[in-house]
Amino acid sequence: MEQKKKVVVAFSGGLETSFTVMYLAKEKGYEVYAACANTGGFSEEQLKQNEENAYKLGAVKYVTLDVTQEYYEKSLKYMIFGNVLRNGTYPISVSSERIFQALAIARYAKEIGAEAIAHGSTGAGNDQIRFDMTFLVMTPGVEIITLTRDMSLSRQEEIDYLNKNGFEADFTKLKYSYNVGLWGTSICGGEILDSAQGLPETAYLKQVTKEGSELLRLEFKNGELHAVNGEVFEDKIAAIQKVEEIGAAYGIGRDMHVGDTIIGIKGRVGFEAAAPMLIIGAHRFLEKYTLSKWQQYWKDQVANWYGMFLHESQYLEPVMRDIEAMLQESQRNVNGTAILELRPLSFSTVGVESQDDLVKTKFGEYGEMQKGWTAEDAKGFIKVTSTPLRVYYANHKDEEV
C-alpha cells in the first residue's frame, strides 16, 4: 500500500483552513497534520474548539504551536523600541504576527518530514506573500498548497462543500471579519469598503464601559514595559494584556488605516488596539525626556524601515537584525514611568518620572534662568550660529524673503 503524503495545514479554525483540511484529506488522500500557530490571539476555548474541529475535518493529528513569547522577543519588543506605527497610524497588528506563525509551521513541517504545507490565504491580500515567502526560504523543496487561491473558491462554495460532507459550523458571511491578535484586532468588511464611511460602535468587539477619566502609569526599564500602575510584570505578554484590559474599557486605540499592500493596491482596514497605542504613546513620551535629539531622529528613521520591512514580508532580510541591534542599544537610558490620562475614546500624556530625565538638569530650565552659561556666552553662540545666514544674505542683498 502506497504511503500517504504528509501535509501540514496552517490551521486557524476559520472557513478557508477548515475547507483545506477536509479537501486535502478526503479528495487528495493526504495525511493531514493541522497546526495552529498561536501568537497570543487565541483563547483556551478557541484552541480546544480548533482541536475538536480539526479531527472532525479529517486531520490525523492536531497541534498548537505557541510562539507568543518568540513573537515578543524577536519582533514585538523592537516595534515598541521603535514606536512603530505604519503611516503614523497602524501598529502593524495581526500582520506582524504572520511571519512567526509561518516560521512555526515551517519548523513543524521539517520536524515531521512533511512533503507539503498548506494555508488558507486568498490571492488578493498580503498574507499569501508572508506565508509563501517564509515557506520558500525555510522549507525549500516542500510543496506549497493554497486551495482557496489556486481554485478561485468563493466562501459559499467552501461552505457548501463542508456542509455536503457532514461538517456543519456557522461560517455564515458576517458583515465584518476580524483578525484578533496580541497587538490589536483588525476589522474588514461593511463600511470599510466605502472610503467615505467610518465604523459604527457596534462594529468593535470591545465596547466602551467606563466614563470619566483615570491616570495610567506605565514604567519602562531599558525600553521594555516593566510595571503597570505599580504592579511589576516579569511576563511582558501579561503586561501587554493588562494594558489592553484597562484601555479597551475606554474604547482607546480605535482608528482607520489606509495603506499600500505588498501587491500594489491600496487597502483600508479598521482596527482597535488599546495596548499598542497606549504603550507606544507612553514609550515615545518617555523617550522625549531621556534620549538626545539625534538619537530620536535616527531611531525614527530606522524604525520606519523596520516597520515597512516587517509589513512587506522582509523580516528574514539580514538588515533587520542590524536594525534590531541599533534599536536595542538605543534603549539603555529609556527608564522611568510615563503618566497618561485616559478618557472615553482618547488619552493624553501628563508627565514622566525618570532618573534619566534630560529636562531637569543643572544647566537650566527652558524659558527660565540659565545656569550653565552666561549672557555673553548665549550672545556669542547666537552670533556664531547665525554666520551661514549672514554670509548668504550679505551676498544676496536683493533677494526678497
State each model region's role.
Residues 2-10, 15-401:
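Nucleotide-activated chemistry modules centered on ATP-dependent adenylation/adenylyltransferase
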